[in-house]
Design a protein with these regions (language model features):
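Bacterial N-terminal signal peptides that target proteins for export
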Residues: 1-9
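Sec/Tat signal peptide C-region and signal peptidase I cleavage site
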Residues: 14-20
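Extracytoplasmic copper-binding redox domains, predominantly the cupredoxin/blue-copper superfamily
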Residues: 20-179
Length: 179
C-alpha cells in the first residue's frame, strides 16, 4: 500500500503544475462488456411514405462493432469550470436536423447563449419539443425544408429531451452548459 500511495503522491505533484498552467484534453471510450442487445425496430405509423422508407431503429443504446457505446454524455459539475479562451462564448449555431424522421445528431451540446438551430430536411412537417428544466420549454412546429432557432439563457443540470409530437418515435437530447 505504501509504494502505491508514494507513487500517487509523486503523480499528483507532477501533474499539478501542468493542470494549473496548461490546457489538456481528456479522451475516453465507453464500451459494453459481452454481447450488445439488438436495437429494436421503431413503430413508424405516421407519414409512412416518408418515414417508413428506411427501417428505423431505436437509438436508446447504440453499440459499434468494437463494443463502443455512442451518445454518452460526460460533463463536469462545478461552479468554477474554466473554459479554453478559444471556446468561450461560442456564437456559431449548433444544428439538430429532423432527417429521415429522426433527429440528427442524437445528442447535441450547446453553450448557454449559443443558438440551437432546429432544422427540418424532411418533406413532411415536424415539431421539436425541447423539455428543459431551467429554460422556457420550446415546441417549434417546423415545416418541410424550414428551421427554427432557440437560444438558452440558463445552464441545464441534465440533458433535455427533444421529441417530435407528430412522430412519437423521434427522440434526441440536448445538453446546455456554460462551458
Amino acid at each position: 500500500l505504501r509504494p502505491s500511495l508514494h507513487f500517487l503522491g509523486v503523480l499528483v505533484a507532477l501533474a499539478s503544475p501542468c493542470l494549473a498552467d496548461d490546457w489538456g484534453t481528456i479522451r475516453g471510450k465507453f464500451t459494453i462488456g459481452g454481447k450488445a442487445p439488438e436495437a429494436s425496430a421503431l413503430k413508424v405509423d405516421k407519414d409512412v411514405e416518408v418515414c417508413g422508407k428506411e427501417k428505423l431503429l431505436s437509438e436508446e443504446l447504440v453499440v459499434g462493432a468494437d463494443g463502443g457505446i455512442a451518445n454518452v454524455v460526460v460533463f463536469v459539475r462545478d461552479k468554477d469550470v474554466k473554459i479554453h479562451p478559444d471556446l468561450k462564448g461560442a456564437k456559431d449555431p449548433v444544428e439538430m436536423d429532423n432527417k429521415a424522421c429522426r433527429f440528427e445528431p442524437h445528442v447535441a451540446f450547446v453553450q448557454v447563449g449559443q443558438p440551437l438551430k432546429l432544422k427540418n430536411s424532411d418533406t413532411v412537417g415536424h415539431n421539436s419539443n425541447v423539455a428543459t428544466l431551467k429554460n422556457p420549454p420550446t415546441n417549434s412546429l417546423i415545416a418541410a425544408g424550414a428551421d427554427s432557432t432557440v437560444t438558452f439563457t440558463a445552464e441545464e443540470a441534465i440533458p433535455a429531451q427533444v421529441t417530435c409530437n407528430i412522430h412519437p418515435w423521434m427522440k434526441a437530447w440536448v445538453l446546455v452548459r456554460p462551458n
